[in-house]
From Swiss-Prot:
Highest taxon above the source species: Bacteria
Protein name, entry field: Uncharacterized protein Rv1320c
Coiled-coil region: none
Family matches, as SUPFAM superfamilies: HAMP domain-like, Nucleotide cyclase
Domain HAMP per the UniProt entry, residue ranges: 278-329
GO CC terms, sorted: cytosol; peptidoglycan-based cell wall; plasma membrane
GO BP: any one term: cAMP biosynthetic process
């Protein structure tokens, strides 16, 4: 039993791939089998592949049917003998001649009808709605053609052999009828499999599949009828004909039943295998695609190649992935407009008006001489320059886990400590300011900017109305950073911070800054001590005018070496 289960479990792999099995299960191809090629395959190569598969599948199926029929007519029902008790010109002339003619005419007619139905694929164009619906009928037409040829053979041979001996009549009707139905159904399923690439293109235009049976239930019941119904009917008819016409011995009756049962068992096994594989493959494709989505890959859609409910499953997966892609696009745009941290906070909890007190550090950056910059350059060049300028700022702010809260013309405001809490927001802000100053000096020497850094308590939250609001920070540190940025434009370093900001910084960061003079910023009552990167702070010639004459006495510049500054 374990060996049988293992064999059954691995059988579908023989259809999926011809390559040896490795330790890792190969990924299911887009059409469910490597035999059908890739989606990117050229149309000409796909036509050759499909035509070859159809020809081989139909010929092999019918050759096997002829072999089984010969066994039934000669071994299962030996009397009367089709060789000894029938005219030789029938057994060695009519029958072989009909088989050859049926193969030739059948192959020609099926090839022509298939090519006509798939003309759009040969011409490498998108099918119309009617052409797409016609493509779904190809498997049914193939099955009906095969059934017609077997039915014609049954009628012709029954009449000819019946004229020689009436006992041939039920034998030929029964044998040819059963084999014809099984062969036609096998050709139907194999043709449906081979035409999956064409069905996928037809489904893209929205055509409704038209087939012999509808849905998974219809397909399953059809195979059940052939695998279980036909053998049972065959055994019952054998018993009836034996009692009525043949009068077989017990041994001969047993041989007849076994010969009738064995081929139908094999054919039934093959049909059930094909049915199980046709059903499982779309599910496996969707399952593997779900695994890719779970890993964050939303790049690919499934090829919808099944006309049953499984095709609706594939279509539903594509709609789901498109929705996820749209959601990611909206999330990306939202994050670009308001900042990744604000977007993440909005996803975690429903946004509401109001805010909370936070300890943050603020970096304000503004271009020096922006009016002259705008008037001296074309508008397109100014936009490109501003984009490069803001790219430097955004890169460094993101690198230090800050939030670019606003773009105001040629200025920007970055916040550290809101909405994401930071253990040392001063360190992050000061390091960001230094990095921006260094990069602007090296990468954009034509664009100089003043940079101000301040820290303290602010109110951070959503400001506006219920219909339209934005996340921002309000408080004295924001105003102080803006005034320091304005003052920094007159210093060679272009970067100033307050000594209060350095009080909250680490010793490692403080060692990179130098204390300067004490000033009273415009709009402020209390003086503050300026700091700037080490060995860069210099007093401007007309700084008294800039700070409103409140500079006071010149302070001695000292290098800060680890001790916290005091006013």
């Amino acid at each position: 039993m374990p060996s049988e289960k293992a064999t059954t479990r691995h059988l579908p792999g023989a259809v999926e791939t011809l390559s040896p099995r490795t330790g890792r299960r190969p990924e299911t191809p887009a059409y469910g089998s490597w035999l059908l090629g890739r989606v990117s395959e050229s149309p000409r190569m796909r036509r050759v592949r499909i035509q070859g598969m159809l020809t081989v599948a139909i010929l092999v199926t019918n050759v096997i049917g002829l072999i089984v029929g010969a066994m039934l007519l000669t071994v299962a029902f030996p009397k009367p003998s089709v060789i000894l008790d029938a005219p030789h010109w029938v057994s060695f002339g009519i029958v072989p001649g009909y088989c050859v003619l049926a193969f030739i005419l059948g192959t020609y007619w099926l090839t022509r009808q298939t090519a006509r139905a798939l003309r759009w694929a040969i011409e490498e164009r998108t099918p119309s709605h009617d052409e797409a619906r016609s493509a779904f009928l190809v498997p049914l037409r193939v099955a009906l053609a095969v059934l017609f040829l077997w039915g014609a053979a049954a009628a012709l041979w029954t009449i000819i052999y019946g004229l020689a001996n009436r006992l041939f009549i039920p034998r030929f009707l029964f044998s040819m009828g059963v084999i014809g139905v099984v062969a036609a159904t096998s050709c139907y399923l194999l043709t449906e499999f081979a035409l999956r690439p064409m069905a996928a293109q037809a489904l893209e235009v929205g055509a409704t599949p038209r087939s012999l049976v509808r849905g998974i239930v219809g397909r399953t019941m059809l195979v059940w009828l052939l695998c279980s119904g036909v053998p049972n009917v065959g055994v019952a008819l054998t018993a009836i004909f034996d009692d009525t016409f043949w009068e077989l011995s017990n041994d001969q009756f047993m041989i007849t039943v076994l010969i009738l049962w064995a081929p139908l068992l094999i054919f039934g096994f093959i049909l059930m295998w094909i049915l199980a594989w046709l059903t499982a493959t779309p599910v496996r494709v969707v399952r593997e695609a779900l695994n890719r989505v779970e890993q964050g890959d939303l790049s690919g859609d499934l090829v919808v190649f099944d006309g049953t409910e499984l095709g609706e499953l594939q279509r539903g997966f594509n709609r789901m992935v498109e929705g996820l892609r749209e959601r990611e696009r909206v999330r990306d745009l939202f994050g670009r407009h308001v900042g990744r941290e604000v977007a993440a906070a909005a996803e975690r909890e429903r946004p509401k008006l109001g805010g909370e007190e936070r300890h943050v550090a603020v970096v304000f950056v503004d271009i020096v001489g922006s009016t002259q910059l705008v008037t001296s350059r074309p508008a397109a060049e100014v936009v490109m320059l501003l984009n490069r300028f803001f790219t430097v700022i955004v890169d460094e702010v993101n690198h230090h886990r800050g939030l670019v809260n606003k773009f105001q013309g040629d200025a920007s405001l970055a916040v550290f400590g809101a909405p994401n809490r930071l253990s040392h927001p001063e360190d992050a802000a000061l390091a960001t300011a230094r990095a921006i100053a260094d990069r602007l000096a090296s990468e954009m020497p034509e664009c100089q900017a003043g940079i101000g850094v301040a820290a303290g308590q602010v109110v951070a939250g959503n400001v506006g109305a219920h219909e339209r609001f934005e996340y921002t920070v309000i408080g004295e540190p924001v105003n102080e950073a803006a005034r320091l940025c304005e003052l920094a434009k007159s210093y060679p370093s272009r970067l100033l911070a307050s000594s209060q900001t350095l009080r909250g910084a680490s010793e490692n960061e403080c060692a990179r800054w130098s204390l300067g003079e004490t000033v009273t910023l415009r709009g402020h009552d209390q003086p503050i001590r300026l700091t700037s990167p080490v060995q860069q702070l210099q007093m401007p010639a007309q700084s008294a005018d800039i700070v409103g004459g409140a500079l006071g006495d010149h302070q001695t510049h000292t290098i800060y070496r680890g001790a916290h500054p005091t006013d």
